[in-house]
Every structure is written in structure tokens, then in C-alpha cells.
């Protein structure tokens, strides 16, 4: 039986795919939120790097980094509840990442929320 996929989840999947592709080809993003993420990439990557000091940005798996970039952008925009953003990011990590990706993504986002005192 096929499950209905939430349109917001589909948009997040598309954004992660665009960010991932951009990490290889620097192609232009077609989605407005993805373009905004790319414009704010240095700020977003600094937050990720600070939350994962043992993992320099250039050593983080590119799909995990793409998922984290999307989630951090969403956390900073505060349009969705923190729990929803983290849950969605973990689901994307299960879909696209390695076996260790969900735990890594969850840990990094949890630390960012804690350090930036983002409202839960």
C-alpha cells in the first residue's frame, strides 16, 4: 500500500536534492528557499561547524550537509516548530543518508537549538 507523502516533505526532498547537486556543480537553484539558503550558506555552515567541531564542513558527507543546511535555515526562519524541523531532517537523513546520518543530523541540530536558544 502506497503512503501519501506530505507536500511539505516533497518540497524538502527537492530542496535537499538541489543543495546536494549544487555542492558538485554550482548549478542555479530553481526554488526560492534554496536560493536563500545558498545566499546564507556561510552563516549556516558556521553554525553547523560550531555544533560539530570534530567534523570540518568539507569532511561532512555532502548529503548530510545538504540536509543540515535546509534544517538550519528552517530553524532560523522559525516558521515551523523545532520538533517538526528536526523530525523532518532525521527522516530525510534516513531516506538519503548513510546508516549513521540520522543520529549525526539529530545531534548537530540538537546542539544548534541548545546553543542558539531557539524556541522549542
Indicate where each model-derived feature is located.
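N-terminal interaction/assembly modules
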Residues: 1-95, 99-102, 107-120
Amino acid at each position: 500500500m502506497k503512503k501519501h507523502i506530505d507536500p511539505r516533505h516533497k518540497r524538502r526532498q527537492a530542496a535537499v536534492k538541489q543543495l546536494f547537486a549544487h555542492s558538485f556543480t554550482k548549478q542555479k537553484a530553481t526554488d526560492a528557499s534554496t536560493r536563500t539558503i545558498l545566499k546564507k550558506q556561510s552563516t549556516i555552515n558556521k553554525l553547523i561547524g560550531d555544533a560539530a567541531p570534530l567534523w570540518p564542513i568539507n569532511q561532512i558527507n555532502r548529503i548530510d550537509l545538504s540536509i543540515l543546511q535546509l534544517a538550519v535555515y528552517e530553524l532560523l526562519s522559525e516558521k515551523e516548530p523545532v520538533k517538526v524541523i528536526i523530525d523532518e531532517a532525521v527522516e530525510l537523513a534516513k531516506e538519503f543518508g548513510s546508516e549513521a546520518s540520522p543520529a549525526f543530523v539529530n545531534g548537530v541540530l540538537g546542539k544548534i537549538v541548545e546553543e542558539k536558544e531557539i524556541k522549542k
